[in-house]
A protein has these predicted regions:
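N-terminal cap/lid segment of alpha/beta-hydrolase-fold proteins
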Residues: 36-67
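Short beta-strand element of the alpha/beta-hydrolase
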Residues: 69-78
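Alpha/beta-hydrolase
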Residues: 76, 109-111, 187, 253
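Cap/lid segment of the alpha/beta-hydrolase catalytic domain
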Residues: 81-91, 98, 108-133
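Alpha/beta-hydrolase active-site loop
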Residues: 127-149
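Primarily recognizes the serine-hydrolase "nucleophile elbow" in alpha/beta-hydrolase
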Residues: 141-204
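The feature captures the conserved acid-bearing segment of alpha/beta-hydrolase catalytic domains
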Residues: 183, 189-244
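C-terminal catalytic histidine-bearing segment of alpha/beta-hydrolase fold enzymes
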Residues: 244-295
Length: 295
């Protein structure tokens, strides 16, 4: 289908010349059956050009030990109910550790209006297509910033997202993606708001539009007992998407715990998605073998 086969130890504040960036840095140990390594965690605020003024985007960088350059994985967060600014900074550690073990730098931006990022994020029934596309500028700013870092490989990026972040990931693929982006990974991508009816039909239709506008390899993960999106809708979304972009793969992983929407964040979910994701990375020609040993 594709083209080829915890505990923080320290914290500090730094400033770069030019635009100031706030860093909160911590050092962690991880391990798996392959060995042991360390990785750092830093919180920075990067600039995104807005309509009237620049916005600061709260962003977390997880960096493996060493000088690099390392391939890049960007992970896009979902949306909690309530005020988006009250949402906590996203730390999807099962996925972070998966990529760290393979010597990726992992960057997790909080989109504008979420957590401590500036700006406002509202849906209020507007187009789900516009909702996804509205976040593309945040991702472009994230990649642009990442490519200023000496330890980032500017030729390899994997874009990952869960829930609304999965939908944003699909939207990004339609918007002249950076040449470094080699693939899109969608975990339970959906837009759902209590205020709005008929979103499922729109998601199905817009999925077709998204598929028509990209040829990037994609992989989709959806379960049978997801509280936010039923499998029938997910199936139809994928059918419409893959009609335009046959370079796509659907993983129906069945039931997971009491809510399949939690697969991405639950450490127990890793044993389900890991073999499929590893095969996908191999197929799209990016690093896929673990090189680290983690705890």
């Amino acid at each position: 289908m594709f083209s080829k086969p915890q505990n923080p130890l320290r914290s500090f504040i730094l400033y770069f010349t030019g635009a100031p960036l706030f860093f909160l840095s911590s050092l962690f140990f991880i391990a798996n059956t392959h060995g042991q390594t360390t990785f750092s965690e830093e919180v920075v605020f990067i600039s995104k050009t807005g309509f009237l003024s620049d916005l600061k985007i709260q962003t977390t960088i997880f960096k493996p030990s060493g000088l690099g350059p390392f391939p890049l994985a960007i992970i896009n967060h979902g949306t909690n109910l309530g005020n988006p600014h009250q949402q906590e900074r996203f730390r999807p550690m099962a996925m972070v550790q998966y990529f760290i073990e393979r010597d990726y730098v992992v960057i997790v931006p909080m989109r504008h209006g979420f957590a401590q990022s500036e700006g406002e994020s509202t849906f209020s029934g507007k187009s789900v297509e516009l909702y996804g596309l509205n976040a593309v500028g945040d991702l472009n700013a994230t990649i642009d910033y990442a490519h200023t870092l000496s330890y980032v490989n500017k030729n390899i990026t994997v874009m990952v997202g869960q829930s609304t972040g999965g939908w944003v990931t699909l939207a990004y693929g339609t918007s002249n993606p950076d040449p470094s982006v080699k693939g899109l990974v969608n975990f339970s991508g959906v837009v759902k708001e209590p205020c709005c009816f008929g979103l499922y039909n729109e998601l199905i239709d817009v999925s077709g539009n998204f598929g028509d506008k990209t040829s990037l390899p994609t992989i989709w993960f959806y379960g049978d007992n997801d509280s936010l999106i039923d499998r029938h809708t997910a199936n139809l979304m994928f059918v419409h998407y893959s009609h335009g972009n046959p370079n796509s793969r659907f993983i129906p992983f069945g039931l997971f715990s009491n809510d399949a929407h939690n697969l991405f964040m639950d450490p127990a979910g890793r044993k389900i998605w890991e073999p499929f994701l590893t095969q996908y990375l191999y197929d799209i020609g990016v690093p896929y073998k673990p090189t680290k040993k983690a705890i």
